[in-house]
Amino acid sequence: MPRISQITDVAFDGIDNPYVPPKTLNISPSLKLHRDWDETVDPVTYEVIRHNLWNINEEHGATIQRISGSPVAMFALDLNPSILTEDAEFVYFGPYMQYMSGVTDTQVKWILEYRSGNPGIKAGDMFLANDPWVGAAHQMDVMLICPVFHEGELFCWITNCL
Protein backbone atom coordinates (compact mmCIF):
# COMPACT_ATOMS: atom_id res chain seq x y z
CA MET A 1 0.00 0.00 0.00
CA PRO A 2 1.45 3.42 -0.94
CA ARG A 3 2.15 6.13 1.59
CA ILE A 4 -0.35 9.00 1.56
CA SER A 5 2.38 11.36 0.30
CA GLN A 6 2.91 9.09 -2.73
CA ILE A 7 -0.74 9.24 -3.84
CA THR A 8 -1.00 11.88 -6.55
CA ASP A 9 -4.19 11.06 -8.44
CA VAL A 10 -6.68 11.41 -5.57
CA ALA A 11 -8.53 14.70 -5.35
CA PHE A 12 -9.57 16.15 -2.00
CA ASP A 13 -13.34 16.01 -1.65
CA GLY A 14 -13.82 16.09 2.14
CA ILE A 15 -15.97 12.94 1.98
CA ASP A 16 -13.83 10.01 0.89
CA ASN A 17 -10.45 11.66 0.40
CA PRO A 18 -8.59 13.92 2.84
CA TYR A 19 -6.58 16.97 1.87
CA VAL A 20 -2.97 16.07 1.07
CA PRO A 21 -0.88 19.18 0.32
CA PRO A 22 0.90 19.05 -3.02
CA LYS A 23 4.64 19.63 -3.18
CA THR A 24 3.97 23.05 -4.71
CA LEU A 25 0.99 24.90 -3.27
CA ASN A 26 -1.48 26.51 -5.66
CA ILE A 27 -1.54 29.98 -4.08
CA SER A 28 -3.34 32.86 -5.77
CA PRO A 29 -0.90 35.37 -7.29
CA SER A 30 -2.97 38.13 -5.66
CA LEU A 31 -1.54 37.07 -2.27
CA LYS A 32 1.93 38.56 -1.88
CA LEU A 33 4.28 36.39 0.18
CA HIS A 34 7.26 37.81 2.07
CA ARG A 35 10.24 36.03 0.49
CA ASP A 36 13.20 38.15 1.62
CA TRP A 37 15.78 36.84 4.05
CA ASP A 38 19.17 37.81 5.32
CA GLU A 39 21.97 35.31 4.84
CA THR A 40 24.46 37.45 6.78
CA VAL A 41 22.90 37.20 10.25
CA ASP A 42 25.67 36.72 12.79
CA PRO A 43 25.42 33.82 15.29
CA VAL A 44 24.61 36.05 18.28
CA THR A 45 21.76 37.84 16.51
CA TYR A 46 20.48 34.50 15.25
CA GLU A 47 20.36 33.08 18.79
CA VAL A 48 18.67 36.20 20.19
CA ILE A 49 15.97 36.02 17.51
CA ARG A 50 15.59 32.26 17.90
CA HIS A 51 15.11 32.48 21.65
CA ASN A 52 12.73 35.43 21.34
CA LEU A 53 10.54 33.46 18.92
CA TRP A 54 10.59 30.48 21.26
CA ASN A 55 9.58 32.68 24.20
CA ILE A 56 6.79 34.34 22.18
CA ASN A 57 5.41 30.89 21.38
CA GLU A 58 5.79 29.77 25.03
CA GLU A 59 3.92 32.86 26.24
CA HIS A 60 1.20 32.19 23.69
CA GLY A 61 0.61 28.76 25.26
CA ALA A 62 0.78 30.12 28.81
CA THR A 63 -1.79 32.80 27.92
CA ILE A 64 -4.18 30.17 26.57
CA GLN A 65 -3.79 28.21 29.80
CA ARG A 66 -4.56 31.29 31.93
CA ILE A 67 -7.55 32.65 30.01
CA SER A 68 -9.23 29.52 28.65
CA GLY A 69 -10.98 28.51 31.86
CA SER A 70 -10.67 24.93 30.65
CA PRO A 71 -9.22 22.34 33.04
CA VAL A 72 -8.19 20.38 29.93
CA ALA A 73 -6.01 23.30 28.80
CA MET A 74 -4.87 24.33 32.28
CA PHE A 75 -3.92 20.95 33.72
CA ALA A 76 -3.72 18.44 30.86
CA LEU A 77 -2.02 20.99 28.54
CA ASP A 78 -4.20 19.75 25.67
CA LEU A 79 -3.25 22.61 23.36
CA ASN A 80 -0.42 23.71 21.12
CA PRO A 81 0.58 27.12 19.73
CA SER A 82 2.66 27.34 16.56
CA ILE A 83 4.55 29.84 14.43
CA LEU A 84 4.77 28.98 10.73
CA THR A 85 6.43 30.64 7.73
CA GLU A 86 4.41 32.44 5.08
CA ASP A 87 3.99 29.17 3.15
CA ALA A 88 3.11 27.07 6.22
CA GLU A 89 6.45 25.50 7.11
CA PHE A 90 7.10 25.19 10.84
CA VAL A 91 9.26 27.69 12.69
CA TYR A 92 8.22 26.72 16.24
CA PHE A 93 5.55 24.72 17.95
CA GLY A 94 4.90 24.66 21.67
CA PRO A 95 5.97 21.96 24.13
CA TYR A 96 2.42 20.74 24.66
CA MET A 97 0.41 18.15 22.68
CA GLN A 98 2.73 17.41 19.77
CA TYR A 99 0.18 15.58 17.65
CA MET A 100 -1.61 18.91 17.25
CA SER A 101 1.50 20.43 15.68
CA GLY A 102 1.63 17.71 13.07
CA VAL A 103 -1.67 18.81 11.56
CA THR A 104 -1.43 22.59 11.87
CA ASP A 105 0.69 23.08 8.76
CA THR A 106 -1.74 21.00 6.70
CA GLN A 107 -4.65 23.21 7.72
CA VAL A 108 -2.72 26.40 6.88
CA LYS A 109 -1.67 24.96 3.50
CA TRP A 110 -5.35 24.24 2.78
CA ILE A 111 -6.20 27.85 3.64
CA LEU A 112 -3.44 29.08 1.32
CA GLU A 113 -4.71 26.92 -1.54
CA TYR A 114 -8.46 27.32 -1.08
CA ARG A 115 -8.83 30.81 0.41
CA SER A 116 -5.98 32.89 -1.05
CA GLY A 117 -7.95 33.74 -4.19
CA ASN A 118 -11.53 33.87 -2.96
CA PRO A 119 -12.27 35.42 -0.53
CA GLY A 120 -8.58 36.26 -0.15
CA ILE A 121 -6.32 36.40 2.89
CA LYS A 122 -5.95 39.86 4.40
CA ALA A 123 -4.40 41.52 7.44
CA GLY A 124 -6.76 41.16 10.40
CA ASP A 125 -8.25 37.87 9.19
CA MET A 126 -8.72 34.96 11.59
CA PHE A 127 -9.55 31.43 10.52
CA LEU A 128 -11.34 28.91 12.74
CA ALA A 129 -10.98 25.28 11.70
CA ASN A 130 -11.79 21.83 13.03
CA ASP A 131 -12.15 19.67 9.91
CA PRO A 132 -10.36 16.33 10.41
CA TRP A 133 -10.37 15.81 6.62
CA VAL A 134 -8.17 18.87 6.28
CA GLY A 135 -6.01 19.27 9.34
CA ALA A 136 -7.59 18.76 12.75
CA ALA A 137 -6.78 15.54 14.58
CA HIS A 138 -10.50 15.21 15.36
CA GLN A 139 -13.51 17.54 15.43
CA MET A 140 -13.12 18.44 19.09
CA ASP A 141 -9.77 20.08 18.37
CA VAL A 142 -10.32 23.63 17.15
CA MET A 143 -7.58 25.67 15.48
CA LEU A 144 -7.45 29.44 15.51
CA ILE A 145 -5.20 30.59 12.67
CA CYS A 146 -3.99 34.15 12.11
CA PRO A 147 -2.00 35.40 9.12
CA VAL A 148 0.58 38.07 10.00
CA PHE A 149 1.38 40.71 7.38
CA HIS A 150 4.38 43.02 7.13
CA GLU A 151 4.36 45.88 4.61
CA GLY A 152 1.48 44.29 2.69
CA GLU A 153 3.08 40.84 2.38
CA LEU A 154 2.13 37.66 4.22
CA PHE A 155 5.02 37.21 6.65
CA CYS A 156 4.01 34.27 8.85
CA TRP A 157 1.15 32.45 10.55
CA ILE A 158 0.38 32.28 14.27
CA THR A 159 -1.85 29.37 15.25
CA ASN A 160 -3.17 27.58 18.25
CA CYS A 161 -4.99 24.31 18.53
CA LEU A 162 -7.10 23.60 21.58
Question: At which residue positions do the language-model features occur?
Answer:
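Glycine/proline-enriched, intrinsically flexible loops and inter-domain linkers
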Residues: 2-123, 131-150, 154-162
